[in-house]
From Swiss-Prot:
GO terms (BP aspect): regulation of transcription by RNA polymerase II
Protein name: Zinc finger protein 814
NADP recorded as keyword: no
Keyword Hydrolase belongs to the record: no
UniProt cross-link Glycyl lysine isopeptide (Lys-Gly) (interchain with G-Cter in SUMO2), position: K335, K391
Keywords: Isopeptide bond, Metal-binding, Repeat, Ubl conjugation, Zinc, Zinc-finger
Zinc finger residue ranges, C2H2-type: 120-142, 242-264, 269-291, 296-318, 324-346, 352-374, 380-402, 408-430, 436-458, 464-486, 492-514, 520-542, 548-570, 576-598, 604-626, 632-654, 660-682, 688-710, 716-738, 744-766, 772-794, 800-822, 828-850
Positions of the KRAB domain: 15-91
Entries under InterPro entries matching the protein: KRAB, KRAB_dom_sf, Znf_C2H2_sf, Znf_C2H2_type
A single GO cellular-component term on record: nucleus
Gene: ZNF814
GO molecular function: zinc ion binding
Amino acid sequence: MAAAATLRLSAQGTVTFEDVAVNFTWEEWNLLSEAQRCLYRDVTLENLALISSLGCWCGVEDEAAPSKQSIYIQRETQVRTPMAGVSPKKAHPCEMCGPILGDILHVADHQGTHHKQKLHRCEAWGNKLYDSGNFHQHQNEHIGEKPYRGSVEEALFAKRCKLHVSGESSVFSESGKDFLPRSGLLQQEASHTGEKSNSKTECVSPIQCGGAHYSCGESMKHFSTKHILSQHQRLLTREECYVCCECGKSFSKYASLSNHQRVHTEKKHECGECGKSFSKYVSFSNHQRVHTEKKHECGECGKSFSKYVSFSNHQRVHTGKRPYECGECGKSFSKYASFSNHQRVHTEKKHYECGECGKSFSKYVSFSNHQRVHTGKRPYECGECGKSFSKYASFSNHQRVHTDKKHYECGECGKSFSQKSSLIQHQRFHTGEKPYGCEECGKSFSSEGHLRSHQRVHAGERPFKCGECVKSFSHKRSLVHHQRVHSGERPYQCGECGKSFSQKGNLVLHQRVHTGARPYECGECGKSFSSKGHLRNHQQIHTGDRLYECGECGKSFSHKGTLILHQRVHPRERSYGCGECGKSFSSIGHLRSHQRVHTGERPYECGECGKSFSHKRSLVHHQRMHTGERPYKCGDCGKSFNEKGHLRNHQRVHTTERPFKCGECGKCFSHKGNLILHQHGHTGERPYVCRECGKLFKKKSHLLVHQRIHNGEKPYACEACQKFFRNKYQLIAHQRVHTGERPYECNDCGKSFTHSSTFCVHKRIHTGEKPYECSECGKSFAESSSFTKHKRVHTGEKPYECSECGKSFAESSSLTKHKRVHTGEKPYKCEKCGKLFNKKSHLLVHQSSHWRKAI
């Protein structure tokens, strides 16, 4: 492969076109690959575009030419400095290009590019090349002259030169922007036109000789070659033809693409401190300053910086200064880069419009990335864990989880990080340091990002909008979480029970149900909780704070849940009405669920027994009956439950919490259902009526149990004696006869009982309490059943009728005894003589005769 012509500097600091050009022979050209040929073509065209902006090529017969020219052509295509007194060999301009370049460009498209005007280097600006006019103009900027006024770019140019001369070069090394002279990289000067004759060639202005053949329709500018016009149009349209297959980024030149691809392939320079590698030495050298040079330290938070401009930008976080304001919309920014990026919103043409949502983009890459929002395409998959991403940047950040070395370890908890800044931010959790304060409310934060997010609360800014329901959010993560409501996505699954969640935080909280972890401990009483929210709610018991106030009536509550329950008392706007019954709801989801009552739709079917349900959560709860799963465990007594609500209700037994208070008498209850039942006592409301006997009940469950008296149903069987019972509680109480269990013990006399109701009645013997008073005669009773029987004395009510003879009775026990007359049943047997009786009282009278005989 041919060696590239090396860059040569003369004593005067000038270079020529051949110093920056590369020539190949046909033999060498055939050894190049297609990609290398494309790269050579683009680099050559760029060089020609640069040289074409420096003026016309003067003929070699000019008497002054030998003193001005720096090269002449030999047969061996070597480039040499001419000797004194020797004229250069005449050559057609195209012959000077070599055999390969002649095939790349047409003669008419690049005549005049082989000029011999000298290029000058500016050492202050990194040895950049300028022609004579631009070089002298550029030097004027260093010495402070201002030969022109007007545009913002010109003012910035003069300002930057002053800053550069004054020694503040770090400003420009930080920004990374190249200096562009007033004349521009691509000047619109034309080259020679027409045929070359033997007569002396004059160097004339291309505008004067009419050499600008190519015009741009957008900017009305004129160019001498088609290639320069093409480059100019790319700047206007930002045409990006070459796409990187690794990350999807596109470029207008193959050379730019080739340089970019080194990011993915070549990383020769590795940092010994943190292991990070770079493809360019300049980037590597700049990075090393992070570890070595940090001269500028922030007095507010102690953070240090290697560059003054970074330090200056950082200080605006504490001061809140935003010096860069957009003239279009008034939005202000603390960094020039952010301001510059924002201005593109107003200036850039957006040629690429999305057919789905109408959003438009100025770059094809941005348009392509956006379309993946609609298609759901995630082309970048991690080879380590299989996770996929829609954007290469997200994929690249994720890969650091697997690849990055974590050199920075926390001395408190041992957690390690790949970046020192991440370690510093993490350590603030241990120290409690919050250096970033909000000027509006005084609240402070541990990171700048958290402060920015918080400030949107004051500004009312909600830049993240949901495409489904037009709801907007101040944080992107809130939008992502919200969108899962529409999509139904629950990406976080519990490995223990298979339950899935839309947010990772909810999964972490749920997993503590299985592990029993309670990491949040109350400093007052030592009680621990599984979530920080539960701890905060509990602490309000000690402080007496009532942070949640009702906006309607001003009543305050210590728990948010209690406030929500209270707010149901006040009528709310219910914009979703049911067409069947007129009932209204606050959300369309609640309306849809309600409509299944009318349609009878039960879309969720159990695979075990075929039973169907109208709600998915009802199916999940039902399926636990088959599996026996009880995922919710009480941390105090170890008892497990199949529903979270049942666990919450149970935990009030240990905490003695009674959040449901009666507004009439002030009595508190641990369950809302008990409060509702209690309130029926004040109102006398008994909404559930038995169709058989007309009896009224407060609860539907009580009605169902009562109806079994009429239909004779007894679904609960005792496995020990095969006796059947109407309800579950009767069975449980009966089973204690076999086990001998008497869990309710009286502290006064030591007597124990199998039923809580019997125990409560017994306690009234010691206290003398008789809460049930007859309004007719003033007689009081300790038991409600005795009071009910007594009232029938005044009313004459006899609800229990014999189906055989029609006789009625005031008590069910009297009816049971009477029925034995018809059936002949005699259940009471004398153990002495074996005689049978239909009443217990008859048995007792009979047994007394045996006792008298014995006496």
